[in-house]
Amino acid sequence: MAGHSQFKNIMHRKGRQDAVRSKMFSKLAREITVAAKSGTPDPSMNPRLRLAIQNAKAVSMPKDNIQRAINKASMGDAENYEAVRYEGYGPGGVAVIVEALTDNRNRSASNVRAAFTKAGGAMGETGSVSFMWDRVGEIYYPASAGSADKVMEAAIEAGADDVESDEEGHTIYCAFENLGEVSKALEAALGEAESVKLIWRPQNNVPVDEERAQSLMKLVATLEDDDDVQSVYANFEVDDETLAKLSAA
């Protein structure tokens, strides 16, 4: 079975072709500003800011944009964004977690609820689905970082818990409290990662057919298109044949 992480790769490839880059940069800038405001504007002293900058650089966000986002926090010119989490069910009973940074909780909740409803799902209370997930660190390297064996060896040495490798690259998982330590050790062995972040990893996935997978893709895309939404997670999987069809679509 092809997991949700592979399915997300399809969406990300399509996104690079179709999405407006300014929207991606806007979301990254918001995380940088919030990270800088929550601690010091010096990334060497602020782990959250350091990771936010690293992830922005990985998608070629201009240095001026990054610095402007940091300055916005240090000059006290930042909106009062807060982190919120929404949970619910999409088509086929698939559990969905939505993370957002917003300056208006009512607006964000209304938009997320509308997306769930339009897709035939329903938004629930906080905690309604998150018990089916684990909060973990995720570190991603492209295939060029090395062979699966090389990355596995480096991950074990760094104290990671799991590695998934395919033709696209290597996804390394670790305990959320060890993310900084593990990513630093991996950087020494493999170079700078393409992304380093905290994620929700499903304990189990729900198998879905092609029609339902398309509905879920549409729901996730709608949610990710919202300016306040930073991340979307869904616990489903599709078989290899369906994955191939979706990749070709």
UniProtKB/Swiss-Prot annotation:
GO terms for molecular function: DNA binding. One of its GO terms (biological process) is regulation of DNA-templated transcription. It comes from the Bacteria. Keywords: Cytoplasm, DNA-binding, Transcription, Transcription regulation. It is found in: Cytoplasm. The keyword Thylakoid does not apply. One of its GO terms (cellular component) is cytosol. Belongs to the TACO1 family. NCBIfam families: PRK00110.1, PRK12378.1, YebC/PmpR family DNA-binding transcriptional regulator. HAMAP family: Transcrip_reg_TACO1. This is Probable transcriptional regulatory protein mll3945. It comes from Mesorhizobium japonicum (strain LMG 29417 / CECT 9101 / MAFF 303099) (Mesorhizobium loti (strain MAFF 303099)).
